[in-house]
């Protein structure tokens, strides 16, 4: 009888463990525990960052794969991982592209460190550190018996891996528009350029852009007919790639505009254009370089109705009319992002000679030392003058007497 009870107990335990891990490649002897730091593996690749999380302790803690998301973005399917059950143990994979770091709110911090440059010489090198976390959502209740899971990660790269000299990372947004012919989808993109010709995309050197460099931005739309134009509601900047970052600076918003920002075209065609001067965020005061991300809240409007949707400063009545017509003549808003724009402070070295000057020791004399050296120089000059004068006088005393020549006068005898 005891043997039968033992067999029943073992079977029930096996069934409970199997139900707990739901058929995933997990071992109850090793994975019946809460997650630990060793459960995450980070692979810092050239193009992507790959994160692997041991899924078995996550299941044991009472969560599923849909509960894990990057940087708290649980409502965004692009910020979740996917299960790989072909390995032991089963893992949840996250892939982060270096070209779209801002998509799920990963943080990018640029610092300067001493190391070998592209030529193998020891100099100051700019390093970009990418960091973030994977967590589970907070429960809607006041208390919870489930542990909150948190996995942190970071990767460091030379800056040339993150900011290519020929192009910048930019995001695109698909926006749905409904008209009399049905519903169509247009793609909005935000691009940065070197000059007002809007031909060559912005090129950022490894050392970063100098402050007050003028950058030209354009919001473009695809798959549009002539009846629709692009309308930029407002554009702003953040220190991170997160458009919802609390630390932000508005370039233009309604009738308010940054003095260094110029809007060339808005609501008049299928492209919005403006320019601004780059700056640094004060929070980066202890860093040689600062990161700036540009965000624009954009919509599509009918070409005939766009002027009514534009902010008309000083005329509240016209603005009220536009608000009433907005729902019928414009699409919803879309946020598009470009960056990072890397800026440098004025004391950031630009070339190898400046780097050498930074690395070489600087010799400074105090007031007493400089006065002593000046006195010695003056005394030496006076001694030299006295020596020359003495030689001149001595030569005059040693000169032979003058011998007169001519005929003798007998009158003096």
UniProtKB/Swiss-Prot annotation:
Q: Which residues lie on this side of the membrane: Extracellular?
A: 20-370
Q: Which GO terms describe its cellular component?
A: collagen-containing extracellular matrix; cytoplasmic vesicle membrane; extracellular region
Carbohydrate-modified residues are: 85, 121, 129, 164, 181, 194, 351
Query: Which UniProt keywords are listed?
Result: Cytoplasmic vesicle, Disulfide bond, Extracellular matrix, Glycoprotein, Membrane, Pyrrolidone carboxylic acid, Secreted, Signal, Transmembrane, Transmembrane helix
Task: Fetch the InterPro entries from UniProt.
Answer: ZP-C, ZP-C_dom, ZP-N, ZP_dom
The free-text tissue note of the record is:
Detected in the acellular cupulae of the vestibular organ, and also in support cells adjacent to the cupula (at protein level).
* Membrane side Cytoplasmic: residue ranges: 392-413
PROSITE patterns in the record = ZP_2
| A Pfam family per the record | Zona_pellucida
**What region holds the ZP domain?**
43-320
Q: What role is this protein assigned?
A: Glycoprotein which is a component of the gelatinous extracellular matrix in the cupulae of the vestibular organ.
The name this protein carries in UniProt is Zona pellucida-like domain-containing protein 1
Q: Which gene encodes it?
A: zpld1
């Amino acid at each position: 009888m005891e043997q039968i009870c033992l067999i029943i107990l073992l079977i029930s335990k096996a069934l409970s463990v199997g139900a707990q891990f739901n058929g995933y490649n997990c071992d109850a002897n090793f994975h019946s525990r809460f997650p630990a730091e060793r459960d995450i593996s980070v692979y810092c690749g050239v193009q992507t960052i790959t994160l692997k999380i041991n899924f078995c302790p996550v299941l044991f803690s009472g969560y599923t794969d849909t509960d894990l998301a990057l940087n708290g973005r649980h409502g965004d399917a692009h910020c979740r991982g996917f299960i790989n059950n072909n390995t032991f143990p089963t893992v949840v994979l996250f892939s982060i592209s270096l070209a779209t770091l801002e998509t799920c709110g990963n943080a990018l911090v640029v610092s300067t460190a001493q190391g070998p440059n592209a030529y193998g010489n020891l100099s100051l090198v700019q390093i970009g550190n990418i960091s973030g976390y994977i967590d589970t959502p907070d429960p809607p209740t006041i208390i919870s018996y489930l542990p909150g899971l948190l996995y942190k990660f970071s990767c460091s790269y030379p800056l040339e891996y993150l900011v290519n000299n020929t192009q910048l990372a930019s995001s695109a947004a698909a926006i749905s528009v409904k008209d009399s012919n049905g519903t169509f989808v247009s793609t909005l993109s935000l691009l940065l350029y070197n000059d007002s010709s809007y031909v060559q995309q912005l090129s950022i050197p490894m050392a970063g852009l100098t402050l007050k460099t003028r950058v030209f931005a354009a919001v473009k739309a695809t798959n549009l007919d002539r009846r629709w134009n692009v309308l930029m509601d407002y554009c702003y900047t953040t220190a991170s790639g997160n458009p919802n970052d609390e630390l932000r600076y508005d370039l233009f918003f309604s009738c308010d505009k940054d003095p260094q920002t110029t809007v060339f075209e808005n609501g008049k065609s299928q492209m919005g254009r403006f320019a601004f001067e780059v700056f640094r965020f004060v929070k980066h005061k202890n860093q040689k370089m600062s990161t700036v991300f540009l965000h624009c809240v954009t919509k599509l409007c009918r070409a005939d109705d766009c002027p009514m949707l534009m902010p008309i400063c000083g005329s509240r009545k016209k603005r009220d009319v536009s608000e009433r017509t907005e729902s019928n003549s414009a699409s919803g808003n879309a946020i598009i992002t470009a960056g990072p724009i890397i800026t440098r402070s004025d004391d950031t070295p630009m070339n190898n000679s400046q780097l050498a000057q930074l690395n070489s020791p600087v010799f400074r004399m105090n007031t007493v030392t400089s006065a002593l050296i000046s006195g010695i120089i003056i005394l030496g000059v006076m001694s030299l003058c006295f020596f020359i004068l003495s030689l001149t006088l001595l030569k005059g005393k040693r000169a032979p007497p003058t011998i007169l020549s001519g005929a003798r006068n007998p009158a003096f005898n």
